[in-house]
């Protein structure tokens, strides 16, 4: 069995689709909802991966736990580390529960792409890349946790990932979704995260994305491409 942390972004969605085509129900998609996603995104992710793909989908509602951990935290890098560390806590708890049910998981798939590795100055660049920022999916496993790692996109760039997603039959609203950081809206908020700031940002982001989608549709019609 293979476990995958599904964020709903392009990268993890393409890996999920790829694994689903190969192993079906042997894939366990764990969607950790930290409450920092875009407006209506959790519902959209669940709909796609419960109706279109025959996988084991687990929705973890961790909004309250993340809110407590991020309370009063203002530094962006500190937010990234907190969100990444708690992700592993949530993820490992699910993996443990699965193992206790007699269905242990050996492999873990990740949506790591080559720019993630470059920005983090990580191992596959041969140590030649300087660290630009940390990525929550490149933080080492917690002590005592081990999976055989599967990273099918680790030599792909974003445009190549999108092309693969289209070929695998993912819907356009997933494949062409605007880039979004793994730690979510927390690092787009200056200062501490609060429910009020999150609500304002979710609504503002939804308006901007709606306008961009409308513009792109008009451009597509005008050029006839």
What are the language-model segments listed below?
Residues 26-28, 56-58, 148:
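Conserved beta-strand segments of alpha/beta enzyme cores
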Residues 110, 115-120, 148, 152-225:
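Mid-to-C-terminal catalytic subdomains of enzymes
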Residues 2-6, 10-47, 139:
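ATP-dependent adenylation/pyrophosphate-handling site
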Residues 10-18, 64, 110-117:
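Core structural elements
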Residues 12, 38, 42, 76, ...:
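Generic structural signal for well-ordered, non-membrane alpha-helical segments
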Residues 29-32, 70, 74-79, 144-154, ...:
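Short beta-alpha connecting loops at secondary-structure transitions
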Residues 42-78, 85-98, 102-113, 125, ...:
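A conserved beta-strand->alpha-helix junction
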């Amino acid at each position: 069995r293979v476990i995958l942390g599904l964020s709903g972004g392009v990268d993890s969605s393409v890996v999920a689709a790829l694994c689903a085509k190969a192993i079906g129900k042997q894939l366990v998609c764990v969607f950790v909802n930290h409450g920092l996603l875009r407006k209506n995104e959790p519902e959209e992710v669940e709909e796609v991966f419960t109706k279109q793909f025959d996988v084991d989908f687990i929705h973890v509602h961790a909004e309250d736990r993340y809110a407590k951990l991020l309370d009063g935290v203002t530094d962006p890098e500190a937010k990234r580390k907190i969100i990444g560390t708690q992700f592993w806590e949530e993820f490992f708890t699910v993996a443990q529960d699965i193992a206790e049910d007699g269905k242990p998981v050996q492999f873990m798939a990740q949506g790591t792409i080559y720019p993630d590795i470059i920005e983090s100055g990580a191992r596959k660049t041969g140590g030649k890349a300087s660290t630009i920022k940390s990525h929550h999916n490149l933080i080492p496993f917690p002590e005592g946790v081990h999976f055989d790692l599967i990273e099918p996109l680790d030599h792909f760039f974003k445009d190549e990932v999108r092309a693969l997603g289209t070929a695998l039959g993912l819907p356009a609203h997933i494949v062409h979704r605007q880039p979004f950081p793994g730690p979510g809206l927390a690092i787009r908020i200056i200062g501490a995260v609060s429910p009020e700031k999150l609500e304002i940002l979710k609504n503002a982001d939804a308006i901007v994305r709606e306008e961009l989608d409308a513009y792109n549709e008009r451009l597509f019609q005008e050029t006839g491409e």
